[in-house]
Amino acid sequence: LHGTNRRQRQMCIRDSRIFVRRAFLDTLGLLPTTHELADFVGDKSAVKRDKLIEDLLNDNNNYAEHWITFWNDCFRNSYTRQYHGGGGGKITEWLKKSLIENKPYDQFVKELINPVQGSDGFIKGISWRGTVNASQVNEMQAAQNVAQVFMGLNIKCASCHDSFINDWTLKQTYSFASIFSDSPMDIHRCDKPTGEKATPAFLYPEIGEINPKAKRPERVKQLAEIITSKKNGRLSRTVVNRLWAIFFGHGLIEPVDEMDNPTWNQDLLDWLAMDFVNNGHNVKHTINLILTSKAYQMPSVPLDEDADEYIFKGPIVKRMSAEQFLDGIDMVIHAASDKFEQRGTGQKRAGLRNLNRLMQTLGRPKRDIVVTRRETVATTAQLIELSNGKAVADLMSRAGEVWSKSGHQPETIINKLFTTTLGREPSEKEKESAKEIVGKNNDPQGISDLFWILAMHPEFQLIQ
């Protein structure tokens, strides 16, 4: 991971601007300001990259407001739909506070499985309107979601019948779901009762046993202790695999929700998981370990979809998320002011806003199911929305108006738009073309058109 041989040193990103932009977006979900970019490029320290990562991880609020998006996808926290018995708003507050505090991951998981005040929405599940089938009752939702999010297990198929895709049985799934039930659960196969009742049990009884005679609160407490115990190496392996997949575009095990699949580097997975546990289940520690590694600092590579076997060559180029795109647009608009030197805009981050059409088109899920990894393949709908959509047009028009009234000369506006949006100054050819678009009188429409061009540019939308 931290190899220092000559070949690896040569393969590290030479362009500081690319690295700092990657680090900002991956850690905080934000673009660096022009001042932060210039300061980093001008820093001659040999350890400036390590210092940058440390600084970014210490920005607790922006860190939390970025990573809350990932966990909201996992927990189906849509902001608008209430969990069973309420609690949507409360889990948002609990989650953000937990991320700001960098709560140890084992404690984080315990408080979600055996809820404290404010964290109970995840286990309560969603109460769907009308009649639901047996595989979507709240107890079964809890079992499916705990297995998927924290252990990388897919038991949804086995919630209806013995699984066709793995070895989990209907009886095992109902036994697991029964831990969350106040009364004995009737087993249903394909929504028809079998006449059997399930006995509460953990999926891996060799790791820990649930007392079937205990009341529900005690059973749930036992489960939280078992899942977060050192015996359950699956918890740590699952989360470090998710982190690796987020930063590199490909997990050590794929898919990330099928942790029984073979890994392409067992030693690395085991070492990362062991280091994670030995350092107090500290998520930021593992992120720092990954982001300061030579592996992370290698040049990005395109996804090779035709390869028979995955071979690590560096981080895979990825698209901005819906939230990163919208936060980036907001930052460029606010950068028109000379007083703008802070990270973020002071406005409500996109990840904390309700879902709208533009966000959904750009890939934010409705959160009616658990999503641990979003689709990243570009769609025709995205192309249409970005090129002709009213929401994007309104954002670009607003940018044109704000920058037109900034008091800057046209050339200054052009340079600032390029450096804020793409992280670099325009080439001479680009500068001449931009001057023709903007005009001599800071035409709002011309500025809007230039910003639209830059916002559609791969250098803006891709994290390289």
Predicted regions, residues:
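Short, exposed "boundary/linker" segments that immediately precede the start
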Residues: L1-H2
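Short, structured secondary-structure elements
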Residues: R7-Q10, R14-E206, R234-M274, V283, ...
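Extracellular beta-rich ligand/substrate-recognition surface
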Residues: K213-P217
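Hydrophobic helix-coil surface modules that form long, contiguous segments used
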Residues: L223-A224, L383
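Conserved micro-motifs of the catalytic ATP-binding
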Residues: G423
